[in-house]
Amino acid sequence: MMPGQIPDPSVTAGSLPGLGPLTGLPSSALTTEELKYADIRNIGAMIAPLHFLEVKLGKRPQPVKSELDEEEERRKRRREKNKVAAARCRNKKKERTEFLQRESERLELMNAELKTQIEELKLERQQLILMLNRHRPTCIVRTDSVRTPESEGNPLLEQLDKK
């Protein structure tokens, strides 16, 4: 029968090979009402041969107690290992965070000290320039051989230019 075709009412249970539960029915013609309930009526006939095999339908076979205990023990060990690994990971992360915090504080302190040192050096430079400018009018050294701080460039660049 093709999909979408209407079944022929004259079909008998015996004429259809392998209809599952209907195979135990007599091969006489069945009405549509009988066909509806044939599965339900013959379920007992289907289960009866399986009964001697001690097959329980709808239930899984229960594992042996020792298998359950072993499985439970494995789960406990796995959970315990996972718990220890998670604690180790949290501790490592905490230590790393603390290290980075200390390093950040150290670098901020160093940065502040360097900025202070820069300000002190700028102030010292200003004082030296002021002293030099005060001394210049009374200086007996030739002025064309002395450079003024304002006309000074970068001494490293000047040395490179000479080469």
UniProtKB/Swiss-Prot annotation:
There is a cross-link at residue 65 (Glycyl lysine isopeptide (Lys-Gly) (interchain with G-Cter in SUMO2)). GO terms for biological process: chromatin remodeling; fat cell differentiation; negative regulation of fat cell differentiation; negative regulation of transcription by RNA polymerase II; regulation of transcription by RNA polymerase II. It holds the Pfam family bZIP_1. Residues 100-128 are annotated as: Leucine-zipper. Phosphorylation of Thr-148 by MAPK8 in response to different stress conditions such as, UV irradiation, oxidatives stress and anisomycin treatments. GO terms for molecular function: cAMP response element binding; chromatin binding; DNA binding; DNA-binding transcription factor activity; DNA-binding transcription factor activity, RNA polymerase II-specific; DNA-binding transcription repressor activity, RNA polymerase II-specific; double-stranded DNA binding; histone chaperone activity. Component of the AP-1 transcription factor that represses transactivation mediated by the Jun family of proteins. Involved in a variety of transcriptional responses associated with AP-1, such as UV-induced apoptosis, cell differentiation, tumorigenesis and antitumogeneris. Can also function as a repressor by recruiting histone deacetylase 3/HDAC3 to the promoter region of JUN. May control transcription via direct regulation of the modification of histones and the assembly of chromatin. This is Jun dimerization protein 2. It comes from Rattus norvegicus.
